[in-house]
Regions:
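Asp-based, Mg2+/Mn2+-dependent phosphohydrolase catalytic module
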Residues: 1-4, 107, 111-112, 127-128, ...
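Active-site neighborhood of HAD-like aspartate-dependent phosphohydrolases
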Residues: 1-47
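A metal-dependent, Asp-based hydrolase signature
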Residues: 42-91
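Short, acidic loop-to-helix structural element flanking the phosphoryl-transfer center
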Residues: 60-64, 78-83, 90-122
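Short, helix-capping/interhelical loops that line the mouth of catalytic, cofactor-
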Residues: 236-250, 297-340, 396-399
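Alpha-helical bundle segments that constitute or directly flank the non-heme di-iron/ferroxidase center
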Residues: 243-271, 294-298, 305, 379-382
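Acidic/histidine-rich alpha-helical segments that form the ligand environment
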Residues: 264-267, 320-360
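Short, contiguous alpha-helical
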Residues: 273-319, 348, 360-399
Length: 399
């Protein structure tokens, strides 16, 4: 089984965003003209959108970033104008359908993928409310209530946007880090292909004009029309579709995605995070406590030691018993997530400030032997992935 991540606009749905966005902005400004000057509103909305695109912090959803940058400068309180916005998406946004083009081949390809036992997910840029994304899927003939997409991102549930590779890491983390081959399918060289490649994903570039249009980094990726996707997959060696999260950019994206995805996975859960899925298994809350303490007492001190000392010795630490000795089962899981997010930000800031050569600094590990900082970060990322999978499976079991 392969998981296909599909871009939406100009991949599954004909939609030239350079033409769509100005009309969208004008329509929204007209609807909100009673509460904000249209010119100022459009300018402020574009600024707020940039804040979403540039967000690299896992402690704020894109919706939270947008709200903070959009409503206060306009002197608005969201709750007081939510009715106007809801009316826009219910009455005005559907009229923009005429700017888009239905692509029957997109419906056919997605249907074939589902029928053959592969999975499809929508990897559109989550800069819109969920309703705007669901409506565009409907225009594409791929209504969410009829197609079993494994994921449809939106600004309510995501913390990162394209071209940040952390978007793709968060996407996969929210799916429990699938162990299947994964392919990103999209038309945009930077947002789809370049960003997915930074994480280490296989890609297929939707391109109607041939290889001469390639101006991205690295070798020209596999490309063609949407109808060429399945023949390409069937002719590809499995190893070419495997993920590879090992470059510094990919590892930082994974580390950034962990607290973000855990926040979404645990948000508004009806079960208690301290509830164990089975006897002898950790609860989601215990996992969050574990991640917090390992980052605080093991990972961050080790990273500092490797940078500040010459080929230091790193003692092995058995952290699993902490769950019992520190009574994680009695602790507040959501508070543990908040604390983990804070220390993870310290880890990220530390790593991002390092020159490239410092990733090669050596150390001696009690268990792994001779190692270097790059390998240590790789171990942290792998540890993250295992525990995100654990939380994902626990929540699924408890629900």
């Amino acid at each position: 089984m392969t998981l296909l991540l599909f871009d939406l606009d100009d991949t599954l749905l004909g939609n030239e965003m350079n033409a769509f966005i100005p009309v969208y902005l004008q329509a929204l400004a007209k609807r909100m003209a009673t509460v904000a000057d249209p010119t100022v509103l459009i300018k402020t909305l574009m600024y707020a959108t940039r804040q979403m695109v540039e967000n690299s912090s896992p402690d704020k959803t894109l919706e939270e970033k947008f709200d903070a940058a959009f409503y206060p400068p306009l002197g608005l309180i969201r709750s007081e104008v939510q009715g106007i916005i809801d009316a826009f998406y219910a009455e005005d946004f559907p009229k923009l359908r005429g700017l888009t083009q239905f692509r029957p081949e997109a419906v056919s390809v997605v249907e074939q993928i589902i029928q053959r036992g592969d999975q499809a997910a929508i990897a559109t840029n989550p800069l819109f409310p969920r309703t705007a994304i669901l409506q565009r899927l409907d225009w594409a003939g791929l209504a969410a209530e009829h197609v079993p997409f494994t994921m449809i991102p939106s600004y309510e549930t995501f913390h990162f946007a394209k071209p940040n590779p952390a978007f793709f890491a968060e996407f996969l983390a929210q799916l429990g880090w699938p162990k299947t081959p994964i392919v990103m399918v999209g038309n945009d060289i930077e947002l789809d292909i370049g960003a997915a490649r930074q994480l280490g994903l296989a890609v297929f570039w939707i391109n109607h004009n041939g290889a001469s249009m390639w101006n991205g980094q690295g070798a020209i990726p596999p490309y063609g029309e949407l109808t060429d996707l399945l023949p390409w997959m069937d002719g590809s060696e499995p190893k070419h579709l495997q993920t590879n999260y090992t470059t510094p950019n990919a590892l930082l994206a994974v580390l950034r995605s962990t607290p973000a995805a855990l926040a979404t996975l645990t948000h508004k859960q009806e079960i208690k995070l301290e509830q164990r899925p089975a006897e002898g298994e950790w609860s989601p809350g215990e996992v969050l406590c574990h991640l917090r303490d390992v980052d605080t007492e093991v990972n961050l001190p080790r990273l500092y030691k490797v940078i500040n000392e010459q080929n230091p010795f790193l003692a092995g630490v058995d952290t699993d018993p902490w769950a019992d000795t520190r009574q994680y089962c009695q602790q507040d899981g959501l508070q543990a997530l908040t604390d983990f997010t804070l220390v993870r930000l310290e880890v990220l800031h530390f790593l991002e400030a390092l020159p490239a050569e410092d990733w090669n600094r050596n150390a001696r590990h009690a268990i792994f032997g001779p190692t270097h900082l790059h390998e240590l970060v790789n171990i942290i990322a792998g540890h993250d992935i295992l525990h995100v999978q654990q939380v994902y499976e626990a929540l699924k079991s408890l629900n």
